[in-house]
Amino acid sequence: MGLRYSKAVKDKYGDREIEGRATMTLNLPQGLYGRFNCKRCWFATKGLIACSDHYLCLNCLTIMLSDGNFCEVCGKTLPKKIVFEESPSAPPYDG
């Protein structure tokens, strides 16, 4: 779940990477000036989604997407498609 595309998307695009997807990082390394935080709430440090030049948590992103299509921090278009850089921590699927 999360790393595989649906059958319709795979039939449409094949195995090539889909353009325009924002990456969601589960654990970011420490930056030059400390930890990376959500620029809207300043509390979230995990599960951040890259906006144009800053990061947003999933909660703040959904709140901003319910208000409109533009970011309150930078004024650019909000990301709507997310790709996980690491696989989420879940038990392996035995099927």
Swiss-Prot record:
Motif (PTAP/PSAP motif): 88-91
GO MF, one example: zinc ion binding
Database matches in InterPro entries: RING_finger_Z_arenaviridae, Z_RING-type_Znf_sf, Z_RING_Znf
Residues carrying lipid (N-myristoyl glycine): G2
Chain positions of all zinc fingers (RING-type): 38-74
Primary localisation category: virion
A single GO BP: viral budding via host ESCRT complex
Lineage: superkingdom: Viruses
Gene3D superfamilies reported for this sequence: 3.30.160.310
The record's account of how the chain is modified after translation: Myristoylation is required for the role of RING finger protein Z in assembly and budding.
Keyword Lipoprotein set for record: yes
Family statement drawn from the similarity comment of this UniProt entry: Belongs to the arenaviridae Z protein family.
Function statement: Plays a crucial role in virion assembly and budding. Expressed late in the virus life cycle, it acts as an inhibitor of viral transcription and RNA synthesis by interacting with the viral polymerase L. Presumably recruits the NP encapsidated genome to cellular membranes at budding sites via direct interaction with NP. Plays critical roles in the final steps of viral release by interacting with host TSG101, a member of the vacuolar protein-sorting pathway and using other cellular host proteins involved in vesicle formation pathway.
Listed HAMAP family: ARENA_Z
Domains: entry comment: Late-budding domains (L domains) are short sequence motifs essential for viral particle budding. They recruit proteins of the host ESCRT machinery (Endosomal Sorting Complex Required for Transport) or ESCRT-associated proteins.
Protein name (record): RING finger protein Z
Organism of origin: Parana mammarenavirus (isolate Rat/Paraguay/12056/1965) (PARV)
